[in-house]
Structures are given as structure tokens and as C-alpha cells.
Amino acid sequence: MVTTNRLVLSGTVCKTPVRKVSPSGIPHCQFVLEHRSTQQEAGFSRQTWCRMPIVVSGQQSQALTHSITVGSQLTVEGFISCHQGRNGLNKLVLHAEQIEFIDSGD
């Protein structure tokens, strides 16, 4: 059985982080990361774009999330999972296990 589930995505935070605490007392921070890049596919350049919902869970990660604002440039590493929205539709969500701020060089 194949069990690999890893994703690394860099981009810009495009929606204000929302902080919540679950009924079991676990803090969560949710935001959306927008990625834009040029990738090579079959020998051709291709413009890529996506918006990925990010969830950061656990007490040890929450101090870092308070520095995340709209416009923050990040690299996020973690695993993906499916979440069902209130409308009943499923969406992929990246559960962050490591977050690094990208220095803009300013």
C-alpha cells in the first residue's frame, strides 16, 4: 500500500487568517495561499495558478500564525486531505506541518 502524502507549496496569503478553537480545545488557524509560477511540462513553459486552503493545528504552531497576514509570502509543507464544506462539496486542504516565511529582499 502506498502511503506517501506530502505537498510543498509557496505563495502569498490572500485571505485573512481565521483562528478558532475546536470543541476539544485544539487551536486552528485557517487561511488561503495563492500560488503563481511558470513550470515546464513536455518541454514547454506553462503558467500555473491555484488557491489552496491551509490549516495549521496545535498549540505549538499558533505563535507562528500570529505573524501571518494577507500579503505574507510563505512556503508551506504538509499533507493534503479532503474537507466537506457547509454546501456539501469536498475541497482539498493542505494541513501545514512546517511554515517558512519567504524573505522578499526589501
UniProtKB/Swiss-Prot annotation:
Disulfide bonds: none annotated. GO terms for cellular component: nucleoid; primosome complex. Keywords: DNA replication, DNA-binding, Primosome. The keyword Nucleotidyltransferase does not apply. The keyword Protein biosynthesis does not apply. Residues 4-103 form the SSB domain. Involved in the restart of stalled replication forks, which reloads the replicative helicase on sites other than the origin of replication; the PriA-PriB pathway is the major replication restart pathway. During primosome assembly it facilitates complex formation between PriA and DnaT on DNA; stabilizes PriA on DNA. Stimulates the DNA unwinding activity of PriA helicase. Homodimer. Interacts with PriA and DnaT. Component of the replication restart primosome. Primosome assembly occurs via a 'hand-off' mechanism. PriA binds to replication forks, subsequently PriB then DnaT bind; DnaT then displaces ssDNA to generate the helicase loading substrate. This is Replication restart protein PriB. It comes from Yersinia pestis. The lineage of its organism: Bacteria, Pseudomonadati, Pseudomonadota, Gammaproteobacteria, Enterobacterales.
